[in-house]
Amino acid sequence: MDKIADWCTYDRAVVTLSDLGLSRRIPQPPESPLLHTRCGSEDYAAPELLMGQPYDGRSTDAWALGVLLYAMMENRLPFDALPGTRGDPAKLRARTPHRIARCEWSWYRYADEDGDWDPKKGMGMEGARDCVESLLKRNTKRKSLDDIAAMPWVRDAINVPGGLKRGDREVP
């Protein structure tokens, strides 16, 4: 579910996640929640995963959400070379993991000349920007999915009678 191709959308406000190829029960303390398996699509992989470090899957999923939100806003992936960049496309593509590892990305469609957010171009998208900028950060500074769910842009957009409930049942 870590890439746009794994999301199925319909004519109503329904999104179905697919390709849930790897999952793991999150253990209770004192057992470590850290994972070591390299998985997922490179374009959506968090820096710690690409660098072979032990990682918390919840945090790398948060990173992948940031990549998805950015892609939906910008119609491009955040770590691809900027449109119009000169050079061999294969060499530019080969640099993508390096840009991910350095958290080197910028806005394009909503950017000013320096790649920073332009309030005029991004009017009405500030909440989405805050989510993306909170997710595409190094692991120690990245917001959790619970933090993102509590952000007004997300919280106020979800209207489910009775509210959303998290299921904590273990599936056999």
Spans of model-derived segments:
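C-terminal lobe of the eukaryotic/viral protein kinase catalytic domain
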Residues: 77-140
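Conserved end of the kinase activation segment
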Residues: 49-59
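Conserved activation segment of eukaryotic-like protein kinases, specifically the C-terminal portion
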Residues: 35-49
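Regulatory extensions appended to serine/threonine kinase catalytic cores
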Residues: 160-172
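Terminal C-lobe "cap" of eukaryotic-type protein kinase domains
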Residues: 137-161
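Hydrophobic anchor on a C-lobe helix of Hanks-type protein kinase catalytic domains
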Residues: 72-76
